[in-house]
């Protein structure tokens, strides 16, 4: 993500905050945080929708929005990789926000995270190209 063009002034500091929250205490703390976040998501619904469904719908969006573009550049794998990587990044950002808020995450916060990520990725042809060729 640090190879992307930063479109908003605070995007890099947002990435740094997420990185510190998730990985700052080491690998074992990261695994414990992810375990607790998974348990939280298994019990919690966000505006009536489970986290699995949210992530699935985001994957459908990324595939639907970009897969057909492979007709022009023959980069089918890149389009799918970008979809998978985007879901992974968003999940990590959700976990970081949840941890920063002492185990709380709302549907509105999920929306904000997805919106900000989408703005950084999709409003730059350079960023789309980088994500499709990682």
Which positions does each model-derived feature cover?
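Hydrophobic, aromatic-lined core segments that form the binding pocket/scaffold
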Residues: 1-134
